């Protein structure tokens, strides 16, 4: 069934585009001559499709590299246990480096959130296309590429447009699975912790002020799922990890909170996330005899843990591939292809998805 047919059936049953969804979604669904409509019409989810990672170049490069080598699960039974093999063996990642729309936080700062939501939808649809541009100045998309079965966003700010993209794919009846840092972190918390648990969010101040975390927790509550209490801070990152954690806990105390933290969610791609350094920092607080440190000990619950966004994203991706039987089952190291999201001077500011010549394999 074509996208047009699905739209007609949906409207016939009284379903219309949600008033909260941006007009761009309605345009794609209704304009049969649009490029986006054509892409959706020709898309079929395939287990041999790529796993797209899209967003600012630095975040995307770091996240793609991590996903290619991470080993969190036993690939035979899916248990949380290292098995010495890459979790995404046999998979191909498609890294899309956005160089023209960054920094994403400027959309919020300038009060132009709708444009960012539209960009998220546009990127999602582009990942499904079977063609891309050979170069920045190419007039036509003539290079073949593999459509994606999953789209992972590497920026927390993209969360603002996830609902729009989800609505588009739901109404059209086709589309990839969408994964984001914020949703991955919040979903992990909702699965693991009871209502009333205190969760700390560690993120850049622009992320916290954008409201993407507040929206994600609110959506969980509206879905009828239990939601933990949460509070967010942005500690100074120009110190040792131990000092950063203490600074975070000091901010937590200064806000009037005394309830022990069950977990801290780290959603920050601007610095290397070091599990060992954080683990050592937690051990230092738990075991220190220094009276100045002792006051922080009571802020950490017995099962306190730190959850990083890259681990949460990897878990979300792995579980959905396993649940929906979308693994390729190829016996090979993960590999990646790369694309540049760029603009073309003199061509109306058109955004293009350009193939890069590099292709690499994790060894």
Tell me what each language-model feature is.
Residues 1-6:
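Bacterial N-terminal signal peptides
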Residues 8-363:
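Non-catalytic structural scaffold of enzyme domains
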């Amino acid at each position: 069934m074509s996208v047009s047919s699905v739209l007609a059936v949906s409207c016939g049953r009284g379903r219309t585009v949600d008033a909260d969804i941006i007009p761009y979604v309605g345009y794609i669904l209704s304009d049969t001559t649009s490029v986006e409509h054509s892409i959706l019409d020709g898309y079929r989810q395939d287990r041999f499709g790529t796993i797209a990672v899209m967003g600012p170049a630095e975040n995307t490069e770091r996240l793609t590299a991590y996903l290619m080598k991470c080993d969190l699960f036993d690939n035979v039974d899916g248990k949380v246990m290292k098995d010495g093999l890459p979790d995404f063996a046999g998979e191909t990642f498609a890294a899309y480096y956005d160089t023209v729309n960054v920094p994403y936080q400027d959309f919020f700062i300038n009060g132009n959130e709708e444009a960012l939501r539209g960009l998220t939808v546009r990127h999602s649809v582009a990942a499904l296309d079977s063609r891309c541009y050979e170069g920045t100045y190419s007039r036509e998309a003539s290079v073949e590429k593999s459509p994606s079965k999953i789209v992972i966003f590497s920026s927390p700010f993209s969360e603002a447009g996830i609902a729009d993209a989800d609505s588009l794919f739901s109404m059209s009846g086709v589309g990839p699975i969408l994964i984001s840092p914020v949703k991955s972190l919040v979903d992990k918390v909702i699965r693991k912790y009871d209502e009333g648990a205190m969760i700390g969010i560690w993120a850049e101040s622009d992320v916290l002020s954008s409201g993407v975390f507040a929206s994600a927790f609110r959506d969980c509550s509206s879905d009828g799922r239990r939601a933990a209490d949460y509070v967010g801070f942005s500690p100074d990152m120009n110190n040792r990890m131990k000092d950063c954690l203490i600074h975070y806990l000091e901010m937590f105390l200064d806000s009037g909170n005394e309830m022990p933290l069950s977990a801290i969610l780290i959603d920050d791609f601007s610095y290397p996330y070091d599990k060992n350094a954080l683990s050592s920092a937690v051990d230092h607080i738990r075991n220190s005899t220094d009276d100045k440190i002792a006051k922080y000990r009571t802020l950490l619950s017995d099962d306190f843990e730190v959850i990083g966004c890259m681990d949460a994203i990897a878990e979300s991706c792995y579980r959905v591939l396993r649940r929906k039987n979308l693994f390729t089952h190829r016996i090979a190291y993960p590999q990646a292809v790369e694309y540049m999201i760029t603009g073309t001077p003199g061509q109306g500011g058109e955004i293009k998805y350009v193939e890069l010549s590099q292709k690499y394999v994790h060894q």
